[in-house]
UniProtKB/Swiss-Prot annotation:
GO molecular function terms attached to this record: amino acid binding; G protein-coupled receptor activity; glutamate binding
CDD domains: 7tmC_GPRC6A, PBP1_GPC6A-like
Entry keywords, A to Z: Cell membrane, Disulfide bond, G-protein coupled receptor, Glycoprotein, Membrane, Olfaction, Receptor, Sensory transduction, Signal, Transducer, Transmembrane, Transmembrane helix
Membrane topology field: Multi-pass membrane protein
Gene: gprc6a
Protein's name according to its UniProt entry: G-protein coupled receptor family C group 6 member A
Source organism (scientific name): Danio rerio
Amino acid sequence: MDLMSFILLWAGLMKVAEASIAQFSQLGASAPGNIIIGGLFPIHEAVVPVNYTGNNSISAPEHPDCIRFYTKGLNQALAMINAVEMANKSPMLSSLNITLGYRIYDTCSDVTTALRAVHDIMRPFSDCESPEDSSQPVQPIMAVIGTTSSEISIAVARDLNLQMIPQISYASTATILSDKSRFPAFMRTVPSDEYQTCAMAKLLKSNKWSWVGIIITDGDYGRSALEGFIQHTETEGICIAFKAILPDSLADQQKLNTDIENTLNIIENNPKVRVVISFAKSSQMQLLFKGLQSRNISNNMVWVASDNWSTAKHILNDGSITDIGKVLGFTFKSGNFTSFHQYLKNLQFESEDEMNNSFLKEFLKLNAGNASNTVLELMKSTNLDKIFSIEMAVTAVANAVAKLCAERQCQDSTALQPWELLRQLRSITFENGGEMYKFDANGDINLGYDLFLWEGDQSDEHADDIIAEYDPTKGGFHYIHNDLSEIKKVVSRCSNSCQPGQYKKTAEGQHTCCYECLTCVENHYSNITDADECSPCDSESMWSLANSTECHPKVFEYFDWNSGFAIVLLILAALGVLLLFFMSALFFWQRHSPVVKAAGGPLCHLILVSLLGSFISVVFFVGEPSDLTCRARQVIFGFSFTLCVSCILVKSLKILLAFEMNFELKELLCMLYKPYMIVSVGMGVQIIICTVWLTLYKPFKDKEVQTESILLECNEGFYVMFWLMLGYIALLALFCFTFAYIGRKLPQKYNEAKFITFSMVICLMAWIIFIPIHVTTSGKYVPAVEMVVILISNYGILSCHFLPKSYIILFKKEHNTKDAFMKNVYEYARKSAENIKGLTGTEPQFKQENSVYTISNLSFVPEEKHE
């Protein structure tokens, strides 16, 4: 290799080395100090893209060209400078005779550029640009304040983790940065997006906005925010109608414009979406709002702004907020910014050679060197929440440094290590603006959010009203302004609300927020708006009609005492009892009269007593049933009526025996006629039936649950026993009817058999009719059916057996004599004998026995023949 070639090669290597070291420094502001703090701020919004697609396009790395000066970024850098100067003046550091210095870099809102700045921060060799002593080593940076973008902070944090240099961000909110296993050196003075997305979901829920859109910037911040927002909206029952993703880089204007147009089309094609949440950049929202105004899309919308652009009112493009709708912005908590504004007013713009802030130089040039106009622009671009967060970050570092340097000499830059400062920061409690603050276990300071409502136009940068505060610890909003009627009028729903009494039915494959409203069926209800399903009523005790908002208690139904029908039947029963008492008294008074003796004598009183029991049994069929009444009513009636019919059976046999002219038949009847035995046997069989019934299959109170009521009724236990009891009574009545029918042609004045026949016909017919009615009838009036039949039977016997005799006793006294009665009997006997002679042609023959029934004995009790 000749000398010339060696010289050229050496020159090339030196040029590359120069490019790799000097040209990549984005240092724009610096100040000396015992402890140096780094700052990373977006002084510019983008870098000029370099095309590396062609083979010939690959060249040595070049210094990036940053474009689009960002005034708010400069403002943030100045806030850090002001905070450092204030800390140096505080007794906390001045008493230790130490100062903080700073080196502030421009990230140009670009990850690669930010990493180049971090490389410069961590460079262990001399700063080539040192004007004083190039051999003096550059002081290491103990902590870094920044950055704004979560995506840049994530990349920067990975590099700073290598030396455990604490990084305190004032605006990066991505949830992933709270993961200390991945980002142990990262801290921040703002809450995580986990809380912001949760607050947004609660805001949507409280205003019943369930059909919304979301716009994000592609990158770690946007993706993380989208993921967290989806998680919280699913919990709150909110659906995302569309997701629009804008490019992270602002340099490729063509791609950005295309994505903005696509987003505008999406918004236009979703007219039901009136609420849009945006985590995009302010410059992207500026283009989006400009497109909305040009397309004349409805301004009846609500835009929910993340902290990324919530205070950037300059994006209105000389328009009014009414042109795009309403903007609700989430901002971090802020404090007193008077000192910072005073700092801006006191800025001294010296000659360029004397100024140590190249960023300020550039901004001054952009304002044509007009210092007063420069200050005015800076004051208008102040983000109060970010200024407060930056001041808090610097204050935290100053307190941690003071704590460490109180125990050691920190004039030497090697006396303190970054990891020691990080450890102290994680545990420090510091004061700022009269309040005490501390980083939590995730390295975050969670102060919550202010919710702003944009007012006025872009010129009113600070005219917004705080309408609410969100406290993450309580998980709710505290509204400062209650008059939010205009916001609450905005409806953002896929489907109209389902009213109480309805429920939502979502078609398969659709969003849960898109549904149709169906009416709740019977015995189901919904008492809230947009119920997911109708709740069933307790079928045992509650009921509801279709489209009901509540369940109604089921009413207990039974044959009530207040029922008009029950009152009528009870009056009839009471009247029957009164008649019984009257007839009992009358028959007892006339117990020796021929009519009473002919009616059965003592048996009459026994029949009256049995009818009294039958009338009383009617009372047990009315009112709320119980186990006792269910068992008592049938048994009382069964015993009473069996006794009554048994006595009537005795009467039937006695009448047949008294007037029977056929000796052989009379002899048979004499053998069968044992009055007390007949009554005892008749009652005994019924007692056996009822005893078995009450022992094995006892009736009980039962309930039948119906649609709107609960029917309380008596369950007879075993209906075979019930019908057996009634069947036995019917059998006795049939015997009575048969015997009475045989002896129906008695003397005209004494036609007891006919009355028995009529009474038994009435009873049998009533109970025959009762059978189909009882079987087919249901409801609370079932007991009334049996009551009616019992009363008919009782009154039938009372009317046929006792009323005619009472009439004779009271009004036909001439017939109530022995002579009148004997005359009728002899007349009946004479006619019977003539009828027999006419039929046979011979005189009737009567066989005499020791014992005869004398017709003169009106009680039909056999008397002995005297010889």
